[in-house]
């Protein structure tokens, strides 16, 4: 069962109309808690709310590296549902009115380097499944240029170099994840043609 399927099962089980969806690696700050409580005491004008996340990795608050604009829809009316994908599921936003909260969730996405690498491995499996039918043939472009551009995106364009060594590590591992995705798609294509 994918994370989206798990969440879609859990949402209607809620006894209240509003649900705050949290992943195990997310923490509600006292400021965010106050904002949500205050919001729920008034008539709700929206169907769901974006919440920005402040990520931490290797003991450091990450200010750049592509993680600075990270936001997720987490406070939802129980009529909302997630799309059915294997990785990075999102609330289906068609015909719903979405707001944005001011305060952030704390996001401790990776406990350590081994955890980051294990998660990238798992995400690349799911991502390969999601992209398998969209990628007719894996080419030199997929295996070499897409990972290279992912590194450039995180390290240069999204200012990962300002996060120092940790920014370099994040950018490198994100590029590695793209490489793994396409190697796994290639593997599936080879075995499907046998």
Language-model features: locations:
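Catalytic-site signature of metal-activated, phosphate-bearing donor transferases
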Residues: 5-12, 18, 22, 29-192
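Conserved short acidic donor-positioning loop in nucleotide-sugar-dependent glycosyltransferases
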Residues: 1
